[in-house]
C-alpha cells in the first residue's frame, strides 16, 4: 500500500472511531451567562492537595483550587456530548441568529458553481449529507457584529466572549495564584475584567473582530483584538499532490484539540468545495479561506484567466457554506510590483504572486482592488470578516521592511476604512521574515496606517538558516510581535518551506505558538495570564508531578519525557527527577532550607542564640547531619 493510501486509511479510521477524549484530570465545565442558552465552555484542571505538615500516617493536606483554561476543543473533549463527524456539531448560535429577525433562508444557492456541484451525482459519495440551509441578510439589512456594536447592541456573542476571555479568574482566592508582574503593554488597554460592554466597544471601534458567519452556527464565539488574549491560527488544507477529505477533517479535530483558535482551509487540490463543507460543519472555531485559491482552480490554474465574475461566484459559494473570514490580497497594486524586482526572494505570497501576475498580464489594477466595495457588500450580507492579505510580505530577512511591504500596508489601511463604511469587520495580515530588531517597526506602522485594526502575522521568522525548525525561528518573532500588540499569530510548522504538514507537524506548530501567545500575554500583563504559571510552579516545587503534566500545554509529551527515565509509579511522587537525581535537586534543598528557616522564625530564642553565636549553631547542625549518616535525602519510600 502506498504512503498516500495508508495516510488516508488511517485518517478514515480516526474519523469512524472518533470518541470523546478529555485531557487528563480535566473536565469540561460550562459557565452560564445572563440567559440559559449562553453556555461558555472552559477546561477545568483538577489538582492534588499540597502536603503542608504532619507525618506519614497523619499528613496535613491543603487543597489546591482547580485551574480553568481557555478551551477551543468544542464537544470533542466533552464526554457528555455525542460526537458524530457525519452529523456535524450542535448549532449553538442558531437561536441567536434567528431571533434577530434580520436574515432569510435561501430557497436556492446564489452561486452558479454550488448549483453545479449539487447537481453532479458523481460527487454523492464525497458530499456531507447534513448540510444546512443557507441564509443571508434581509434586503436592506446588515448582519455584522460590527453593525450591532455600532448601534449599541450587546449581542449574545459578545457576552459569551466576555465570559470566555475572563476564564473564571474572579473565583481564585489564593494570593499566590493571583500574583502577577505588571507587564509592559505598549499602549494597549487591558482592563482588570472583560465585560460585554467592553467587547462591544472594542468591536465598534474596529480594534477587535468577532469572525462569525451566520451560516456557521456551530462556531463558539471568539474575539481577535489587541486588548484580548493573543490568538493562534492553524492552517490545514489539501494540495494537488497530497491529502484527502478524511485527512483534513482529522487535522481540524487535532488542531482545535491543541489550541487552534481559528483554522484556515488553504486547500488547492481536488474537491475543495466538498472538503470545506465537512470542515465547517464539524468546526467549533471560525474557519478562514483564501478564495483566490479556489477561483484559480476554476480557471485551470491560469492566473491571467481570472476575472471578477469567477471570483464573485466563489465568494458567494463560500459565504453560503459558512466561511467566517476571507483573506483578500486587494492591496497588491500594479505600481508596487516593480518594487519587488530587487528583492532576494521576490513575491512569496501565493495570493500576492497570483494578483501580481494578473496585474502585469492585463496592465491594470487588480479586480480585487477595483471591486473592493462589492466584496464588502457581500461580506455584510453574511457577516464575513475580511483579513486583508499582505501579498507583498517579505520572504527573507533581507527583504524585511522594504518599500513594497510598507506601500501595500498603507493601501490596506485605506481599504480598512472602506470596509468599515459597510460595517464589515477587518483585520490586517503581516509578515513574514523579519529580524528581531526590525519587528517593532512593523507593529508601529500597522497601528499608524491601519487605524488599530487587529494585526495577524505569520511569525515573523527571525532568521532563514533553519529549514525543519521554522516553528522555532518564527516562534521567536511571534512572541515578540504578540507582546507589541499583534492580535493573532498564524502558526508555522516544522514543515514550513519543505512540505504539507501532517498531523504530528500540526501539533508541534500549535503547541509552539500557544506557548508564544501565552508568553506575549504575560509580557503585556494581561489580567490573569499568570495564574496557570503560578499553579504549575507551585506544583513543581511541591513535586506534584501529575499536576505538572496536566497543567502544561502538552500533558502527553511532558509525561512521556518524564517516564523515559523514571517510568515507575514511585517516580510520580519522587522528590527529584532524572536531571539532577536525588542528591542534587535544588528544589528539594530549597524546601529543607525553607522548613529550617520557618522553624527558626517560630522559635525566637533559637533564632537569637544562633545570631549571637553563628559558628556554634553551624557546628551543631553539622554534627546532626553527620549523626544521620551524612544522607542528604531519605529514601523515596520513606517520604510522606
UniProtKB/Swiss-Prot annotation:
[4Fe-4S] cluster binds at residues 577, 580, 585. Pathway: Cofactor biosynthesis; thiamine diphosphate biosynthesis. Substrate binds at residues 235, 264, 293, 329, 349-351, 390-393, 429, 456. It is an enzyme of class 4 (lyase). Binds 1 [4Fe-4S] cluster per subunit. The cluster is coordinated with 3 cysteines and an exchangeable S-adenosyl-L-methionine. Its EC number is 4.1.99.17. Keywords: 4Fe-4S, Iron, Iron-sulfur, Lyase, Metal-binding, S-adenosyl-L-methionine, Thiamine biosynthesis, Zinc. It catalyses: 5-amino-1-(5-phospho-beta-D-ribosyl)imidazole + S-adenosyl-L-methionine = 4-amino-2-methyl-5-(phosphooxymethyl)pyrimidine + CO + 5'-deoxyadenosine + formate + L-methionine + 3 H(+). Its cofactor is [4Fe-4S] cluster. One of its GO terms (molecular function) is carbon-carbon lyase activity. One of its GO terms (cellular component) is cytosol. The keyword Metal-binding applies. Zn(2+) binds at residues 433, 497. GO terms for biological process: thiamine biosynthetic process; thiamine diphosphate biosynthetic process. Pfam families: ThiC-associated (PF13667), ThiC_Rad_SAM (PF01964). It comes from the Bacteria. InterPro entries: ThiC (IPR037509), ThiC-associated_dom (IPR025747), ThiC/Bza_core_dom (IPR038521), ThiC/BzaA/B (IPR002817). Homodimer. Belongs to the ThiC family. Catalyzes the synthesis of the hydroxymethylpyrimidine phosphate (HMP-P) moiety of thiamine from aminoimidazole ribotide (AIR) in a radical S-adenosyl-L-methionine (SAM)-dependent reaction. HAMAP family: ThiC (MF_00089). This is Phosphomethylpyrimidine synthase. It comes from Photobacterium profundum (strain SS9). The lineage of its organism: Bacteria, Pseudomonadati, Pseudomonadota, Gammaproteobacteria, Vibrionales.
Amino acid at each position: 500500500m502506498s504512503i498516500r493510501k495508508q495516510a488516508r486509511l488511517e485518517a478514515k479510521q480516526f474519523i469512524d472511531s472518533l470518541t470523546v477524549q478529555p485531557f487528563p484530570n480535566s473536565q469540561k465545565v460550562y459557565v452560564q451567562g445572563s440567559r440559559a442558552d449562553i453556555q461558555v465552555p472552559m477546561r477545568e484542571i483538577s489538582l492534588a492537595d499540597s502536603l503542608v505538615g504532619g507525618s506519614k500516617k497523619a499528613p496535613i493536606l491543603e487543597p489546591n483550587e482547580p485551574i480553568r483554561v481557555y478551551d477551543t476543543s468544542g464537544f470533542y473533549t466533552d464526554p457528555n456530548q455525542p460526537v458524530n463527524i457525519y452529523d456535524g456539531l450542535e448549532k449553538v448560535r442558531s437561536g441567536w441568529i434567528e431571533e434577530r429577525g434580520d436574515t432569510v433562508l435561501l430557497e436556492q444557492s446564489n452561486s452558479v458553481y454550488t448549483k453545479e456541484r449539487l447537481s453532479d451525482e458523481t460527487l454523492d459519495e464525497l458530499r456531507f449529507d447534513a448540510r444546512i440551509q443557507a441564509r443571508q441578510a434581509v434586503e436592506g439589512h446588515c448582519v455584522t457584529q460590527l453593525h450591532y456594536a455600532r448601534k449599541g447592541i450587546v449581542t449574545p456573542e459578545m457576552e459569551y466572549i466576555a465570559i470566555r476571555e475572563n476564564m473564571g479568574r474572579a473565583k481564585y482566592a489564593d494570593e499566590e495564584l493571583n500574583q502577577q508582574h505588571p507587564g509592559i503593554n505598549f499602549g494597549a488597554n487591558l482592563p482588570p475584567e472583560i465585560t460585554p460592554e467592553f467587547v462591544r466597544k472594542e468591536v465598534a471601534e474596529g480594534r477587535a473582530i468577532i469572525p462569525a458567519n451566520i451560516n456557521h452556527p456551530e462556531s463558539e464565539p471568539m474575539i481577535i483584538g489587541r486588548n484580548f488574549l493573543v490568538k493562534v491560527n492553524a492552517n490545514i488544507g489539501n494540495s494537488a499532490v497530497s491529502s484527502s477529505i478524511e485527512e483534513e477533517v482529522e487535522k481540524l479535530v487535532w488542531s482545535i484539540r491543541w489550541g487552534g483558535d481559528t483554522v484556515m482551509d488553504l486547500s488547492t487540490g481536488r474537491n475543495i468545495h466538498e472538503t470545506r463543507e465537512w470542515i465547517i460543519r464539524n468546526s467549533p472555531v471560525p474557519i478562514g479561506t483564501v478564495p483566490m485559491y479556489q477561483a484559480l482552480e476554476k480557471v485551470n490554474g491560469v492566473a491571467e484567466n481570472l476575472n471578477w465574475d469567477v471570483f464573485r461566484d466563489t465568494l458567494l459559494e463560500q459565504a453560503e457554506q459558512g466561511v467566517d473570514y476571507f483573506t483578500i490580497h486587494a492591496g497588491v497594486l500594479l505600481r508596487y510590483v516593480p518594487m519587488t524586482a530587487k528583492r532576494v526572494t521576490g513575491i512569496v505570497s501565493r495570493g500576492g504572486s497570483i494578483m501580481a501576475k494578473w496585474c502585469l498580464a492585463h496592465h491594470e489594477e487588480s479586480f480585487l482592488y477595483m471591486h473592493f466595495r462589492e466584496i464588502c457588500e457581500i461580506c455584510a450580507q453574511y457577516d464575513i470578516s475580511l483579513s486583508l492579505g499582505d501579498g507583498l510580505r517579505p520572504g527573507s530577512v533581507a527583504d524585511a521592511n522594504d518599500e513594497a511591504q510598507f506601500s501595500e500596508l498603507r493601501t490596506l489601511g485605506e481599504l480598512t476604512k472602506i470596509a468599515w463604511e459597510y460595517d464589515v469587520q477587518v483585520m490586517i495580515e503581516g509578515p513574514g521574515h523579519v529580524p528581531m530588531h526590525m519587528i517593532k517597526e512593523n507593529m508601529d506602522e500597522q497601528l499608524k496606517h491601519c487605524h488599530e485594526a487587529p494585526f495577524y502575522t505569520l511569525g515573523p521568522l527571525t532568521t532563514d538558516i533553519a529549514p525543519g525548525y521554522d516553528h522555532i525561528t518564527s516562534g521567536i518573532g511571534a512572541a515578540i510581535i504578540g507582546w507589541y500588540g499583534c492580535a493573532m499569530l498564524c502558526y508555522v510548522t516544522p514543515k514550513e518551506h519543505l512540505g504539507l504538514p501532517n498531523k504530528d507537524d500540526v501539533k508541534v506548530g500549535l503547541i509552539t505558538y500557544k506557548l508564544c501567545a501565552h508568553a506575549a500575554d504575560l509580557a503585556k500583563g494581561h489580567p490573569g495570564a499568570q495564574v496557570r504559571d503560578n499553579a504549575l510552579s507551585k506544583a513543581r516545587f511541591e513535586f506534584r508531578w501529575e499536576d505538572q503534566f496536566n497543567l502544561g500545554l502538552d500533558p502527553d509529551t511532558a509525561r512521556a519525557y518524564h517516564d523515559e527515565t523514571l517510568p515507575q509509579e514511585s517516580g510520580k511522587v519522587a522528590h527529584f527527577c532524572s536531571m539532577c537525581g536525588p542528591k542534587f535537586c535544588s528544589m528539594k534543598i530549597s524546601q529543607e532550607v525553607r522548613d529550617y528557616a520557618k522553624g527558626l522564625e517560630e522559635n525566637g530564642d533559637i533564632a537569637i542564640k544562633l545570631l549571637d553565636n553563628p559558628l556554634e549553631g553551624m557546628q551543631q547542625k553539622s554534627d546532626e547531619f553527620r549523626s544521620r549518616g551524612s544522607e542528604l535525602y531519605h529514601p523515596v519510600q520513606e517520604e510522606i
